[in-house]
Amino acid sequence: MNMKEISKVVDLVRESNPLVHNITNVVVTNFTANGLLALGASPVMAYAKEEVAEMASIAGALVLNMGTLRPDEVEAMLLAGKSANRNDVPVLFDPVGAGATSYRTEVARHIPAEIELAIIRGNAAEIANVINEKWEIKGVDAGAGNGNVVSIAKQAADELNTVAVITGKEDVVTDGERTIVIRNGHSILTKITGTGCLLTSVIGAFVAVEKDYVKAAVAALTFYGVAAELAAAKTVEKGPGSFQIEFLNQLANTTSGDIEKYGKIEVI
């Protein structure tokens, strides 16, 4: 897997304009939709249990995000996820805040038990709690802690039979056999709500067009990180508001050439 190979997936997303069905949280809906549009994908936010199965069946990818968790939303996620599985639509799961409360942790473990996942994406604490490994968490954004991130990612990939993506200062992608570390991004991303949630949906757009889910995830993370770096270079001194606007611009303007030039990945 080389940078040229990875960068081509960016062009493929823009050429294909994949439909990404998001059942996401109320905090990030607008930002997620705008980010996907900027990238070149087609977002749809359909939540009603009466329509999610049908919508998921025609999507390029389905993204399930439990940031603002409600019982009716969980029901919709299960209906959509099972429909996606029946129709060979890849499902991505973002277990936001797994470990923060008993209910949230229960749901985070129930969804992978019921739905076949292409990708699970979270911080180290969230992924550890999904697979019942000890890792402290405070609130839905906690990611720091004591533990081996690569080991947790590999364990999650093996136990859940999926590609595990753990994001943080460095990002890890693994299917249990192939493991890649991505070292792009910028710390100002943590000052904008929803950047992690948008990232999962961006990975969804890449997974919709690239069936090697490890390659798709690595391409998405590299693209996202480079876009953040380019946006930060123009706006970081102004603050997070200016960065957010420029980040959307860079999601639209970052090219495959930029990925080849600035991408930083390591196969381990």
UniProtKB/Swiss-Prot annotation:
Key word Kinase present: yes
Required cofactor names: Mg(2+)
Keywords: ATP-binding, Kinase, Magnesium, Metal-binding, Nucleotide-binding, Thiamine biosynthesis, Transferase
Catalyzed reactions: 5-(2-hydroxyethyl)-4-methylthiazole + ATP = 4-methyl-5-(2-phosphooxyethyl)-thiazole + ADP + H(+)
Residues annotated to bind ATP: R121, T167
InterPro entries the UniProt entry points to: Hyethyz_kinase, Ribokinase-like
Biological-process GO terms, alphabetical: thiamine biosynthetic process; thiamine diphosphate biosynthetic process
Residues at which substrate binds: M45, G194
Molecular function terms, GO-annotated: ATP binding; hydroxyethylthiazole kinase activity; magnesium ion binding
Enzyme class: transferase
Pfam family, any one: HK
Cystine connections: none
E.C. number: 2.7.1.50
Superkingdom of the organism of origin: Bacteria
Pathway note: Cofactor biosynthesis; thiamine diphosphate biosynthesis; 4-methyl-5-(2-phosphoethyl)-thiazole from 5-(2-hydroxyethyl)-4-methylthiazole: step 1/1
Family statement drawn from the similarity comment of this UniProt entry: Belongs to the Thz kinase family.
Functional note: Catalyzes the phosphorylation of the hydroxyl group of 4-methyl-5-beta-hydroxyethylthiazole (THZ).
Name under which the protein is recorded: Hydroxyethylthiazole kinase
Organism listed in the record: Bacillus thuringiensis (strain Al Hakam)
Gene that this sequence comes from: thiM
